[in-house]
């Protein structure tokens, strides 16, 4: 069984933090070739200015302790990626609400990690997550029965290579993925109990982390 870890970057153990930065570099810079402005020359880790104290990192480890997935959650009440990524001329209504969190830097194999990330967001008070996906990933989510709500233009009319969409964190959404919110919450390992009132928030010893390949969604 994989282990799901959640916490602020500053709260994660140093070895896990370094492994996460290297994993993100391997996926988003080396494999996908994203031109990320905050990546310094000759460095092999990937962070940006959004990886601060408002941001929650989610890390998936294999039973052997290898990093095989990651995600990043940011509250829309603070600066977040979509607002910077998209121009004001896009005419999008960017949310600013404690119940809406942005999902970014998501990489995982299959759909195993995604419901866990949804559960982390729900544990932080979110009732909805927003983010960008490619049309192919949007189709994948729809095949699983998720109700994607388009925040921007419908993909059939949009000229962008990605789609801005939202998912409501309802019991039905978890059920579509064969998951239960309470069960997922209890399986998440929190570092330094970020949300004391959240059921299932615990601190555990984390096994040694190393990188492994992952499919990106």
Predicted features and spans:
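Residues that flank catalytic or metal-binding motifs in active/ligand-binding sites
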Residues: 54-56, 69, 99, 161
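Charge-rich, low-complexity intrinsically disordered segments
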Residues: 105, 159-217
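Acyl-donor binding region in acyl/amide transferases
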Residues: 81-163, 167, 171
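Short amphipathic alpha-helix that is part of the acyltransferase structural core
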Residues: 1-46, 52, 57-67
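Short glycine-biased active-site loop of nucleotidyltransferases that positions the nucleotide triphosphate
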Residues: 48-50, 154-155
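Short beta-strand element of the conserved SAM-dependent methyltransferase core
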Residues: 58-61, 73, 163-167
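Short, hydrophobic/aromatic-rich beta-strand segments within well-structured domains
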Residues: 57-59, 72, 117, 130
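Short, His- and charge-rich active-site/binding loops that engage polyanionic ligands
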Residues: 61-94
């Amino acid at each position: 069984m994989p282990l799901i870890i959640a916490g602020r970057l500053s709260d994660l153990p140093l070895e896990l933090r370094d492994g996460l930065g290297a994993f993100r570099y391997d996926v988003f810079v080396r494999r996908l070739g994203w031109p990320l402005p905050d990546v310094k020359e000759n460095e092999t880790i990937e962070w940006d200015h959004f990886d601060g104290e408002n941001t929650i990192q989610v890390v998936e480890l294999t039973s052997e302790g290898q990093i095989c997935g990651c995600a990043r959650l940011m509250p829309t009440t603070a600066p977040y990626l979509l607002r910077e990524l998209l121009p004001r001329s896009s005419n999008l209504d960017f949310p600013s609400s404690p119940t809406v969190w942005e999902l970014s830097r998501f990489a995982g194999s299959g759909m195993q990690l995604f419901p866990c990330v949804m559960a982390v967001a729900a544990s932080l008070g979110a009732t909805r997550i927003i983010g960008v996906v490619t049309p192919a990933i949007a189709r994948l989510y729809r095949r699983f029965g998720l109700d994607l709500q388009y925040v921007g233009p419908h993909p059939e009319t949009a000229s962008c290579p990605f789609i801005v969409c939202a998912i409501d964190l309802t019991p039905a959404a978890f059920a579509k993925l064969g998951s239960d919110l309470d069960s997922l919450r209890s399986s998440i390992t929190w570092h330094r109990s970020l949300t004391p009132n959240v059921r299932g928030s615990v601190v555990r010893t984390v096994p040694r982390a190393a990188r492994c390949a992952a499919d990106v969604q």
